[in-house]
Amino acid sequence: MKVTINGKEYSFRDGETILELAKRNGIFIPSLCQFEPLGHKPATCRVCLVEIMDKNGKRMAAACETPLSDGMVIDSISRHVRDMQRTQVELIFADHDQDCVSCVRHGDCELQDLGESVGLSRNRFTSKLPQKPQGRTLDETANGMTRDMSKCIRCLRCVEVCRKIQGVAALTLDGKGTDASIGVGMADDHATSACIQCGQCIMVCPTGALAEKDENDIVIDMLSDPEITTVFAFAPSVRVVLGEEFGLAPGVNVEGKIVGALKAIGADIVLDTDFAADAVIMEEGTELLHNIKHGGKLPMFTSCCPGWVNYAEKHFPEILPHVSTTRSPQAVLGALAKSYLTDAMEIDPGRVRVISIMPCVAKKDEAKRPELARNGVPDTDVVITVREFARLLRRFGINLSDVDPEPFDNPFMSSSTGAAVIFGSTGGVMEAAVRTVHAILTGRELDTIEVAPLRGMEDVKEAEIDLGPENGRIKVAICHGLRNAQKLAEDALAGKSPYAFIEVMACPGGCVDGGGTSRIKKKYHPHAKTRQQALYRMDRSMPRRQSHNNPQIRKMYGDYLGEPGSHKAHDLLHTCYSSRKKVPSQTIEK
């Protein structure tokens, strides 16, 4: 079967569209709404117009949705076709907020790229319409992200990823024609909707319609206040993602450069969230052992991912008794920085501000949970994403590539293990927990410290762990992408789960591809495996690879907390949850 494109003959596959064949053969046809990684082709933007001749005659058609037929003749480059494509782009711009310089996506926008690709030098319609579309929603009610519908081009990618990957279906298409916009279902606003603020919609949005809530000015205010002691910390995955924002290859470890950059902008203390990850394993592992030995709720689910916690509270509150009460590493670090650290360093905790650099949008929401505050004062004051941190450094004129590496600051909360590093990958929390739980129960380390069945990008993975003759074997599971968590939660509630412990990460690939990480236009997590492998290499290079072997963790428990699971540890390092159910539980198919 053959067709002709711009005078040249090509063979095509059964069911293939014009745009798919063109891409496969390196023929450029401008497009916007189509998103190949998700198989998404709603044909709403109509930019990929081509002229076709087939048995039905000559006509214009959208290349993304038009299937090929034998003998079809396609024109994508004539003056007439180019004019039609350009006109369509002009109309999209005319219905779009054109204050580009203030947009978070300025210079990294697919719509701007599209204007260049069709040769748009002047918009005939701009002077005839308001520069900013009227009556469009600007919703800033959510803690982690903003929705500006004046910048929405109705590509429906956000609706697709929310439904197809996350199974949340918080976003809907409301209205018709030019009055159509993306809404939040029956909710009054974003904050009260079914959205779990994972940020995966931001990762696929081609414009600035969806974005993290920028808090860099708050950070700069803290840095400039001489009465404040700023404590910065960053997550495991940040060190293998941030470099991409400054032109470095995916997976390059820039840990030392991050510390150096933070010192350059005036940070007083730089800690490692990896330390807190080791503390999480000590608490979560102790909690799991208690549940196994004393008939507690099984399976126990991890609690590190705030997107998952939001999902559990809003969609499956019945599962909350199964969710570990151990705080996330971010929340653990914030609590310890304003108690253990301030005591050890003789600092007034009232003047300490904790700034957390995360790969995650939902972490912003987590930091504002009232359960993670003491006397109304949040343990973590500000959370900025990888993208925000890159913008912050640029505001200080810093190129990370040029920064000399520096070590973490103090001897109290800066040591970590390989187990903490792999928290950044799906399966990492479970693998770290298995390493420590096995050692506590058997008195010896795992024969093979790397638990291969828990690694990789499969939606759901499981492993069987031998805990010695007295304790037998347990099955554990991990999943990433919340649609995959639905079945595991349903089985647990029905008493059908064969697992003792289940790790859930909201974002595909885990934190290395969180909603606050670097975006690659028209791609969806293309560097997940590269970033994961970088974390695994770091794990292998660490002198200690089990959380219980971290000397600073041992010192903290010996000097301050007592033992894992102690009353003081529970007061500082554990939390609680409550139902915020918005919609009936539902299984959303692929």
Identify the function of each model-found stretch.
Residues 46-197, 203, 210-229:
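Fe-S ferredoxin-like electron-transfer domains
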Residues 14-77, 81, 93, 213-590:
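Iron-sulfur-associated redox domains of electron-transfer enzymes in respiratory
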Residues 11, 141, 151, 194, ...:
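Charged, low-complexity surface patches
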Residues 1-2:
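Extreme N-terminal starter segment of soluble prokaryotic enzymes
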Residues 11, 154, 301:
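Conserved SAM-binding loop
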